Amino acid sequence: VTAWPIRLHAACDELVWAARLNLAWIVFTLAGGAVLGIGPATVAAYTLARRHARGESLPLWREFAAVYRREFARGSLLVLPLVAAAGVLYGNHRYFAALGQGAEPLRLATLAGLIALAAVTAYLLPMYVHYDLKPLACLPRASRLVLARPASTVLLLFVLAAVVSAAGILPFLALALAAGAWIQLNTWLCLRFFAENEAHLHPKGV
């Protein structure tokens, strides 16, 4: 009986954390003029999400600002190409959808490209903050994980789709919670996937 209040309290704490992380991500993205801010803000959010998932208690705003400054150049190098690729694919998808049935194969191709990009990105960002890797070194490793762990990849895409759908139904969530919730869930899941992968590659006693 006493477990339910504890679980409810923990769930509320996680929602509050996700909302605070979401707000910090928005504020620091805008502080960089959106284009220059989204890279370091995203890396900072994933860095703090990793530390939170590992049980650390930390001053969010001060630590966010510190990582944001430290990762300003590398964060942009990591994130901006992903944002640009997503923008091009989404724009082409909408364009081909507007052309009707004649462009259906091209529409499906761009949709497949968007799904593949989402899958790679879902591994790439948590990987960058978890391992000591250069931005360009993350892409091939994340791509291999997409193929090597199909069940994990499907789960990540399902969670992403659920967050996006919830934000679409309740637009307030998109502003107040969606990005922070996805970043925290994405990081939490990937830390477990990385641990499983390492255990498989380096079994104990071998």
Where are these regions (language model features)?
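Helix-coil boundary and N-terminal low-complexity module in membrane systems
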Residues: 1-106, 110, 117-206
